[in-house]
């Protein structure tokens, strides 16, 4: 009998180790599912664990339950936090073909502005605005659509839910108040091009179809004045878009009506400002040298105060 026990210990023929292995494998699978769910949703350890336990470790069902709970809690939290100051946030910019959108989304702290859930929402809002404008009736002119907070909340995303619903969901995730502040969207005819810029600029600028975000943003509508388009024209236009962010012009300016400011540091007309990339030239001189004309531009600074009438505009070229 002693020999039999020793043999079992050496060869592992006892049933206890086998049960232990099965328990260990199950525990490992649960940990893996928990880690996957947390990474995918960003919700707390406790909530993810509860969701998996309720749905037999079914990831899809657990994720759906978490989203439904977060939506309910998000609207509740959004109501409780409503009215709290949201002076921080991000500006999202997306140019896709002949449509450009710039959206400002605000939050309470810079800490949340760096949160992935918040940044993803800014990108989703930018893309939603582009899709929304694509569905509107248009004409042969450059159109400029201003959207206020309430109008933005009504825009539907591809999943059928509104931006307002997704805002509440995000508020429930980040735990502080947030708001859809405003948006400006352009839709350009064939002869007009669009470009955009955000500051700080993203490290990887090789994916133009992905919405960019920063503390400042600008959109620029431009066209070539020559029949043959200069291949460098779009690069110059983007530099001018960057100039708009840095130098804060308030209007385009017209040589026939406007005179340069007496003090160049006080200049607010875009065409008379010293070019940010090379102050030895004015923006107007750079545009003329590259056979470009700026049709319109818009600049957002996160947290700035603007007049309500500026958010509802329509421009023609």
UniProtKB/Swiss-Prot annotation:
It is found in: Mitochondrion. Pfam families: EF-Ts_N, EF_TS. One of its GO terms (cellular component) is mitochondrion. Keywords: Elongation factor, Mitochondrion, Protein biosynthesis, Transit peptide. Gene3D superfamilies: DNA helicase RuvA subunit, C-terminal domain, Elongation factor Ts, dimerisation domain. GO terms for biological process: mitochondrial translational elongation. Its main location: mitochondrion. The keyword Disulfide bond does not apply. One of its GO terms (molecular function) is translation elongation factor activity. Residues 1-24 form a transit peptide. Associates with the EF-Tu.GDP complex and induces the exchange of GDP to GTP. It remains bound to the aminoacyl-tRNA.EF-Tu.GTP complex up to the GTP hydrolysis stage on the ribosome. Belongs to the EF-Ts family. This is Elongation factor Ts, mitochondrial. It comes from Culex quinquefasciatus.
